[in-house]
């Protein structure tokens, strides 16, 4: 089916008055940082990428590579360094802030820090030390609707965080540029009902990752506007893949499923396409939609999906004059 126009938000923070505005092209944004760039022989200053996941994954690698190539073509002189937080499942979430500060402290000459992924965003935006708040930062490759990373005293399997707008937290930090997106749950519900007007129940699947829990929190926040729809949350923090499949077989009639993400289950086991295959066989008559593009084209009927691609070129044109 033909998809609606994707929605993508690009934002910049003016340092003096802290007001947000939508931007398309900002070639002069970082003039104070790059107009007097030194040669590598004169300075060890660098641009530091901090990725939430392995930088060798195609999506992350392509965006970093596009940035570096275009940055050089536009005359950038600073070296680019990539560090990886190696974030996986939520069982290690309490370590993420310490992992991030170790990376930042390792690179005191970073002229600019580029945070890629929700784990990196949320970890950074909950650092209280003023030295981190003053770092010039770009944020990309994550939804604006995130969660607070749990503290040591919080049991991750029962943690029920509210969805928070991370772009609001950015006002306390030196975030110069933010490329983000937002899942439009209202449009997804509208699409489901247009196909299945008898829909009475929503099934939402999410996994044992930061993105999974952030998506679940965002869906919960939106579903309060639909009291007529009951909801089942199949949660990878408490479910193995087999347990999730069994729960899917027992959903009420007139249910419609909305896919978030299922990459890692409660045991920390990582799944690729085999999880989609298992879910699709569990309840073949259940209509399925996707808010993340997962399974669209071979299992999910459709969904209102943000635009994820093209981040590299957007960032690099704001990094060099």
Model-derived features: where do they sit?
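Conserved small/polar residues in nucleotide/adenosyl-binding loops
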Residues: 318-320
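Short, well-structured alpha-helical segments in soluble
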Residues: 90-111, 126-129, 245-254
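Short beta-strand segments enriched in small/hydrophobic residues
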Residues: 43-59, 202-205
């Amino acid at each position: 089916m033909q998809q609606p126009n994707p929605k993508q938000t690009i934002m910049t923070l003016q340092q003096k008055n802290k007001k947000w505005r939508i931007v398309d092209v900002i070639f002069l944004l970082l003039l104070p940082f790059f107009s007097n760039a030194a040669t590598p022989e004169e300075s060890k200053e660098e641009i530091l990428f901090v990725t939430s996941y392995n930088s060798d994954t195609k999506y992350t690698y392509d965006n970093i590579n596009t940035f570096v190539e275009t940055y050089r073509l536009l005359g950038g002189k600073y070296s680019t360094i990539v560090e990886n937080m190696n974030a996986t499942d939520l069982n290690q979430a309490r370590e993420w802030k310490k992992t991030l500060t170790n990376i930042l402290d390792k690179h005191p000459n970073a002229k600019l820090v580029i945070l890629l992924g929700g784990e990196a965003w949320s970890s950074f935006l909950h650092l209280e030390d003023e030295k981190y708040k003053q770092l010039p930062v770009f944020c990309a490759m994550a939804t604006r609707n995130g969660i607070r990373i749990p503290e040591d005293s919080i049991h991750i399997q029962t943690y029920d965080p509210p969805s928070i707008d991370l772009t609001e937290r950015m006002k306390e930090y030196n975030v110069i540029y933010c490329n983000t997106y937002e899942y439009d749950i209202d449009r997804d519900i509208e699409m489901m009902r247009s196909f299945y007007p008898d829909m009475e129940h929503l099934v939402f699947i999410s996994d044992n990752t930061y993105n999974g829990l952030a998506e679940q929190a965002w869906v919960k926040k939106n579903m309060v506007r639909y009291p007529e729809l009951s909801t089942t949350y199949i949660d990878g923090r408490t479910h193995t893949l087999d347990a999730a499949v069994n729960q899917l077989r027992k959903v009420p009639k007139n249910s419609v499923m909305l896919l978030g993400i299922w990459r890692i289950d409660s045991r920390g086991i990582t799944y690729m396409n085999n999880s989609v295959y298992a879910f699709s066989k569990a309840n073949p008559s259940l209509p399925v939609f996707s808010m993340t593009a997962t399974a669209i084209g071979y299992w999910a009927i459709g969904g209102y999906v943000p635009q994820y691609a093209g981040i590299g070129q957007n960032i690099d044109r704001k990094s060099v004059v």
